[in-house]
Amino acid sequence: MTPRIESEESAPLVNKNNNNNNDNNNNNNVDEENPLIIESGIPIEDLEQKNKPYLIKVPNIDKPDSKWINFKTLWAFTGPGFLMSIAYLDPGNLESDIQAGAMAGYQLLWVLFWSTVIGFWLQMLASRLGVVTGKHLAEHCREQYPKTPRLLLWLMTELAIIGSDIQEVIGTAIALQILSNGHIPLWAGVLFTAADTFTFLFLEKYGIRKLEAFFCSLIAIMAISFGVEYIISKPDQIEVVKGVFIPLCSQNNISQAVGILGAVVMPHNIYLHSALVQSREIDRKSETQVKIANKYNRLESAFALIISFIINLLLVSVFAKGFYGETTEIGLSSAADFLMDKYGKVAKYIWAIGLFSAGQCSTMTGTYSGQFVMEGFLKLKIAPWKRLLITRCTAIVPAMVVAILSTSHLDSLDQWLNILQSIQLPFAVVPVLLFTSSEKIMGSKFKNHWLNNQFVRFLSLLIIAINIYLIITFSMQISESAWMISIVSISFFFYFIFIVYLSMGQENFNSMTKKIKNLFNNNSNQTYNNINY
């Protein structure tokens, strides 16, 4: 069944038959639909100047792309993909890498690889949506869904962002404790993260390119740190290759495998990427320019995610080599001591530097995600520092409670937050698939190919199936009582119904429920008549 989209406001400007109408709509909707582009949190109407300082000009974008790769053009598009890839390297990912290596050895490297491939596929849908339409995913959700489901979808997305932010707070606090030799307690590190993030907002004043370069340097620090750990630990290269290409997973390691998927493919990152790609200046009425933008965004994102995969692979391999079969309790908070005992004091501090860089990187991208999501869903303009204050304070409360009362539960909290991301993932995957499949939104030349649709639908069903397993496992771990199983079952029922609604749209969903109701009524009447007869 082809989903029906309720609004035609989002039709892309590359649709040649509607250029004039679209130009008018675009001019009329600037103030309402695009309150923020990228820089310094200034509304777009205040930035409408000739030189458009909030957009980055792309050389040769108006000419047909004669080369397979024009490196000047690629350089101009370099940035959004690396900012997007930071979510693949946040403290939640590092926690997942540690658990996978220590609990399963090299066996789950194939899960890491295919999770990254899946992530790339989904990020390309988000990127194409932003480039073709000039609107990001949250804005399309506001236009296409009615108020109540839209608000519920916003709450689910905010929950994912807050969950990720808790991991960033915990990761940074642990890194500070290690680097200070324990002189900075966890609770103080948690408070520190509430303040240090605001310094990044000042970088925006120097231009988006400076901000992108700064975060690329933090990614480089992570690569060097974990690369040194890899050299020190000397993992078995043959086992690493086998782990990437030979799929193995015992029943005991299913939770680690799901944790990898939840850590790598994060829902809020799909919303973020659809907005970041709009920082490059293109004419969306030009089919050539849109194609060039899609091509170079794809190349840059692929390169960035290859780097993120290598960094994660290095970390899994380090802990597989050193700790597989030797320990059952290891995480962000205890990894440094294990590394020091195994490889010396230098390994401990190198690990802390990499962890600190991961926490700082993901902090700012989380802020951007929250900003775009709030403005897109609620049409609410809010200064970045206010948005950061709200999100960070919300994340600090649970992190502070755990840091003060039970530091031993930090790693367990991180693992469950990764699983939370997996459960929330359909709330980003389903809308981006729906919108990029729509000819009304994407145009006939940029909508998804049918094969692409089938693949992403398969991924959605796979994610839902995994989440069913997680929910059942979680309920059995908490309690085997009938009331707990009932609560979990009811929760999952509404979870599944909401996903079905999002995938169909309101009109198709109402039509389906009406048919089911009529079928039920007809069967009831027939049964009643048979009894009377």
UniProtKB/Swiss-Prot annotation:
Sequence ranges on the Extracellular membrane side: 90-101, 180-182, 234-256, 324-348, 409-415, 479-481
GO cellular component, one term: plasma membrane
Location of region: Disordered: 1-33
Compositional bias per record (Low complexity), positions renumbered to this chain: 14-29
Transmembrane segments: 69-89, 102-122, 159-179, 183-203, 213-233, 257-277, 303-323, 349-368, 388-408, 416-436, 458-478, 482-502
GO biological process: defense response to bacterium; iron ion transmembrane transport; manganese ion transport; phagocytosis; response to bacterium; response to imidacloprid
Domain of life where this protein originates: Eukaryota
Stretches of the chain found on the membrane's Cytoplasmic side: 1-68, 123-158, 204-212, 278-302, 369-387, 437-457, 503-533
Membrane topology according to the record: Multi-pass membrane protein
Known glycosylation sites: 253
Localization per Swiss-Prot or TrEMBL: Membrane
A single GO molecular function term of this UniProt record: cadmium ion transmembrane transporter activity
InterPro entries: NRAMP_fam (IPR001046)
Disruption phenotype: More permissive hosts than wild-type cells for intracellular growth of L.pneumophila and M.avium.
Key words of the record: Glycoprotein, Ion transport, Iron, Iron transport, Membrane, Transmembrane, Transmembrane helix, Transport
Role according to the record: Depletes iron from the phagolysosome in an ATP-dependent process. May rather act as a symporter of protons and metal cations in an ATP-dependent process. Nramp1 overexpression protected cells from L.pneumophila infection.
NCBIfam families hit by this protein: nramp (TIGR01197), Nramp_1 (NF037982)
Family: Belongs to the NRAMP family.
The protein's name: Metal transporter nramp1 homolog
Organism of this sequence: Dictyostelium discoideum (Social amoeba)
